[in-house]
């Protein structure tokens, strides 16, 4: 069993900074103001061949109301999940009433807890941590997480002995192999091999949309638990949360993202970070669920986000949420509006659901699997060339500069999204209308649904272009004799 280490403490004591250093990532958002982390975030850490799972949590300060209450609940859940707790305090700010309250709760849980005093760089650490002895948690470990000072000592003297106790050495290799395989699958860094089978990898599914359209509610409905903070206020989710799950004997990695709104309305520095994280999650995903609020309709920002998804080549499922409670007349108006504004995306399935009540949610994964299978299905060169030939016979390529464009053969150029490479003469001069015709013809012939398809064109090049003809010595002698003969004849 891989040990679980939770980082808890007041807001802005450096939990996310330490999380990023332990996991050697930038997965947790970090900035110099409180309340940045709202959901518990999991990361894999490895030190000297020992592995453990690290949980970053939102801060607890005892004055929570509204969404902050749910953040505190997430921190308490992380404590229950953990084998070891690192209780972080701010050495510069000194002992606070919230620190005392958290310490009291930790003592009642009887979890192995270690007190870590952060931000000790540039000050007398012994003097700065003196007040924290009153918490009664034993030894205090001073560190500077932003610079890494004291972190190695913390790992060697505190974490490693507990990791070895919870996870004996003989079990580490088996667990390490599992987590290495999982990490490669999630990060998408596996080397391509001839017998590659996309069904062996988890489907990375990103749930995106404008703020407060119900993304986290949908995530929790799918998972069957309050895994992500949900609150009726735009912008509750600020980070992208990666959650492994299994459904119908198929593995998934669910990515709940922050809402994306118009750039002019993004005034909060953290929200700018969150938008970047969301766009990165789209790039990282195999399939994207775009959630739209049925009551608000499709905004320009929805279309902008949709354009980014299509440009990224991600498979797409459109989810119209908050469908419950709408009258039949309003529903017809919404469907007409969808047909009008989304008519250019005829390959994506559209689902009408209520994430809050669960209606229609069960049908989403059939479309997700269909889109993923379409985007990763292997096609032979013979099949693609045959389809290309049929397309050119049904509708001949146009004339370019008085010559007919000739399509020679086609082959696969990549997957997720599927790419078809067509070779021929003057193919780069084809008009956009004929390129769209070819794309739609390939989509119908290959029965591709839920994913965009891309066509690339390559022209045959003259191998002797820009090369001067060089004569052999024998040819040079013949040339001299010929020139000499011509001169004599004159």
Swiss-Prot record:
UniProt keyword GTP-binding, yes or no: yes
Gene Ontology BP, a term: ribosome biogenesis
Could you give the subunit structure recorded for this chain?
Associates with the 50S ribosomal subunit.
Query: Pfam families, alphabetically?
Result: KH_dom-like, MMR_HSR1
The chain positions of domain KH-like read 377-461
An example of a GO molecular function for this protein is: GTP binding
Can you name the source organism?
Enterobacter sp. (strain 638)
Q: What is this protein called?
A: GTPase Der
Q: Which residues bind GTP 1?
A: 9-16, 56-60, 118-121
């Amino acid at each position: 069993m891989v040990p679980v280490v939770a980082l808890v403490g007041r807001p802005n004591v450096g939990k996310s900074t330490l999380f990023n250093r332990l996991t050697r990532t930038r997965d947790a958002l970090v900035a110099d103001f409180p309340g940045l982390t709202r959901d518990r975030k999991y990361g894999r850490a490895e030190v000297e061949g020992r592995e453990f799972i690290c949980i970053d949590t939102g801060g607890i300060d005892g004055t929570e109301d509204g969404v902050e209450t749910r953040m505190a609940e997430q921190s308490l859940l992380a404590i229950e999940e953990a084998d070891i707790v690192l209780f972080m305090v701010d050495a510069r700010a000194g002992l606070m009433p919230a620190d005392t309250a958290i310490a009291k709760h930790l003592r009642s849980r009887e979890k192995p807890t270690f007190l870590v005093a952060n931000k000790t760089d540039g000050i007398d650490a012994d003097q700065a941590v003196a007040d924290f002895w009153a918490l009664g948690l034993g030894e205090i470990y001073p560190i500077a997480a932003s610079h890494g000072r004291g972190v190695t000592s913390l790992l060697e003297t505190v974490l490693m002995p507990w990791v070895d106790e919870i996870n004996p050495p003989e079990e580490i290799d088996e667990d390490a192999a599992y987590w290495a395989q999982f990490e490669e699958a999630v990060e998408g860094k596996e080397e391509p091999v001839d017998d590659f089978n996309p069904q062996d990898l988890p489907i990375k599914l990103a749930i995106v949309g404008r703020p407060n359209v119900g993304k986290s509610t949908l995530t929790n409905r799918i998972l069957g638990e309050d895994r992500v903070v949900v609150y009726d206020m735009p912008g509750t989710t600020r980070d992208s949360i990666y959650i492994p799950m299994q459904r119908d004997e198929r593995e998934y990695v669910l990515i709940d993202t922050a809402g994306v709104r118009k750039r002019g309305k993004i005034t909060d520095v953290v929200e700018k970070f969150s938008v970047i994280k969301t766009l990165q999650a789209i790039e990282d995903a195999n399939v994207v669920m775009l959630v739209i609020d049925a009551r608000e309709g499709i905004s320009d920002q929805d279309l902008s986000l949709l354009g980014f998804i299509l440009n990224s080549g991600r498979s797409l499922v459109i989810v119209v949420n908050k469908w419950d409670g709408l009258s039949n007349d309003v529903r017809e108006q919404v469907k007409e509006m969808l047909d009008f504004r989304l008519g250019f995306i005829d390959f994506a399935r559209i689902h009408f659901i209520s994430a809050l009540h669960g209606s229609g949610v069960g049908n989403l994964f059939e479309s997700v699997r269909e889109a993923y299978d379409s985007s990763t299905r292997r096609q032979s060169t013979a099949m693609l060339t045959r389809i290309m030939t049929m397309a050119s016979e049904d509708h001949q390529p146009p004339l370019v500069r008085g010559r007919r464009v000739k399509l020679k053969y086609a082959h696969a150029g990549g997957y997720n999204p599927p790419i078809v490479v067509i070779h021929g003469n003057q193919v780069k001069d084809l008009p956009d209308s004929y390129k769209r015709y070819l794309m739609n013809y390939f989509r119908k012939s290959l029965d591709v649904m839920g994913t965009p398809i891309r066509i690339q064109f390559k022209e045959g090049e003259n191998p002797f272009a820009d090369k001067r003809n060089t004569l052999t010595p024998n040819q040079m002698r013949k040339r001299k004799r010929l020139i000499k003969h011509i001169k004599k004849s004159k």
